[in-house]
Amino acid sequence: GLFKTLIKGAGKMLGHVAKQFLGSQGQPES
């Protein structure tokens, strides 16, 4: 239970970070 929740949370966070990273590729860092 807890382990699965941690994995899910980590995946969500990684997805968010990846989105931010990919989104910043076409824009200059501010």
From Swiss-Prot:
Domain of life per record: Eukaryota
Any one GO CC term of the record: extracellular region
Tissue: Expressed by the skin glands.
Compartments where located: Secreted
The entry's keywords: Amphibian defense peptide, Antibiotic, Antimicrobial, Cytolysis, Hemolysis, Immunity, Innate immunity, Secreted
GO annotation, biological process: defense response to bacterium; innate immune response; killing of cells of another organism
Functional summary from the UniProt entry: Antimicrobial peptide, active against the Gram-positive bacterium S.aureus, the Gram-negative bacteria E.coli and P.aeruginosa, and the yeasts C.albicans and P.brasiliensis. Has hemolytic activity (100% hemolysis at 128 ug/ml).
Family (UniProt): Belongs to the frog skin active peptide (FSAP) family. Dermaseptin subfamily.
Protein name, as recorded: Dermaseptin-3
